[in-house]
């Protein structure tokens, strides 16, 4: 059977597509992967996708050429794993193939697709969706079993390995600056200041900074020079060694949840101009006079939709299982909150238990592949 996968951003590619592609290959299916246009792209998606062993790789590209190429795709099933549903519908309609979609929340274009999501609370917010577990958890399990012999892609590692020591009470703290180069560039001095302020409060605290697989060595050296000890290794291996994490809203919130890592999720207002916005709103937000106001309005809409909650695991429950800060937040305020959290041993233990309780079972990729209609029309 031929299966076409569509995705856009770096989190979806490595956290969703990877386990699904591995499972499809294990079942003997032919897999084509389309990398869609994405304002959130890191620039290294094609390099990462080349490790997945798919039979056909297209993109990232846009414009009329992409649209025409999709009309020529011959496939038995389309699975959309991120991106505008317009693209998945295009291939499904041209190939007369069923369209499946995996998403964390409601989005335009789901009508006509079979929709799957990770958690029951998400399914309740998406009409007709079925909760099958989190693909990100399957990706972390791939990290733990990573080897070419087992069909899992091997990643390049950075110069600074996972050389945690056992500090005398300060804790092992993992910084996650994200996959988008503009945000990482702005985050370097900000996180360096946060590390210095944290060490002033907890001298024994040991900081490492986790990077996506294909961050250039030159950039890693900049972070190492700033004392932030970069680590370029599978998230599923590094996160399990951490006592605490500092991150931003995004897919890695769920990675940390599955690994049971207590975390502080921070969204400083000073980074607002660096956050990409998709579609026409993104074009308008880039205008010099009105752009910042539009970004602030977009941020307010998101906060209002989730009652002011920014950490993804906190949106699954009425409890604050991850600490969070947003608004006019400074590195010093962030360090102070981290020091408070790290000094509360009972609170950390409780957070680990609550995060792991939310995690659920693995196997989402297998369940999604089980839902692919057979060639005789059965599922």
Residue ranges of model-derived segments:
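Nucleotide-activated sugar donor-binding and catalytic core shared by glycosyltransferases
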Residues: 1-379
């Amino acid at each position: 059977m031929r299966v076409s996968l569509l995705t856009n951003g770096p989190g979806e590619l490595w956290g969703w597509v990877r386990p699904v592609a591995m499972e499809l290959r294990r079942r003997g299916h032919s897999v084509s992967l389309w990398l869609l246009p994405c304002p959130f792209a890191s620039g290294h998606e094609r390099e990462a996708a080349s490790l997945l062993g798919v039979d056909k790789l297209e993109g990232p590209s846009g414009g009329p050429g992409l649209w025409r190429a999709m009309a020529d795709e011959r496939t038995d099933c389309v699975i959309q794993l991120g991106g505008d549903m317009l693209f998945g519908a295009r291939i499904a309609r041209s190939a007369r193939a069923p369209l499946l979609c995996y998403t964390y929340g409601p989005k335009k274009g789901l009508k006509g697709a079979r929709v799957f999501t990770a958690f029951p609370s998400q399914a309740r917010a998406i009409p007709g969706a079925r909760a099958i577990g989190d693909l990100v958890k399957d990706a972390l399990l791939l990290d733990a079993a990573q080897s070419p012999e087992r069909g899992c892609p091997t990643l390049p590692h950075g110069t600074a390995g996972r050389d945690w020591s056992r500090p005398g009470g300060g804790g092992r703290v993992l910084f996650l600056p994200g996959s988008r180069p503009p945000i990482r560039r702005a985050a370097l001095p900000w996180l360096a200041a946060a590390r210095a302020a944290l060490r002033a409060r907890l001298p024994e605290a040991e900081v490492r900074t986790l990077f996506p697989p294909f961050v250039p060595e030159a950039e890693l050296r900049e972070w190492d020079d700033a004392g932030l000890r970069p680590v370029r290794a599978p998230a599923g291996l590094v996160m399990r060694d951490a006592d605490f994490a500092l991150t931003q809203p995004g897919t890695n919130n769920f990675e940390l949840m599955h690994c049971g890592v207590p975390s502080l999720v921070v969204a400083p207002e000073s980074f607002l101009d660096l956050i990409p916005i998709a579609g026409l709103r993104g074009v308008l937000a880039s205008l010099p006079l009105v752009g910042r106001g539009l970004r602030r309005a977009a941020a307010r809409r998101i906060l209002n939709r989730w009652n002011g909650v920014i950490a993804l695991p906190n949106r699954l429950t009425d409890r604050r299982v991850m600490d969070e800060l947003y608004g006019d937040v400074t590195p010093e305020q962030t360090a102070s909150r981290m020091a408070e959290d790290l000094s509360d041993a009972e609170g950390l233990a409780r957070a680990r238990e609550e995060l792991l309780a939310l995690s659920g079972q693995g196997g989402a990729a297998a369940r999604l592949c089980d839902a692919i209609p057979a060639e005789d029309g059965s599922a």
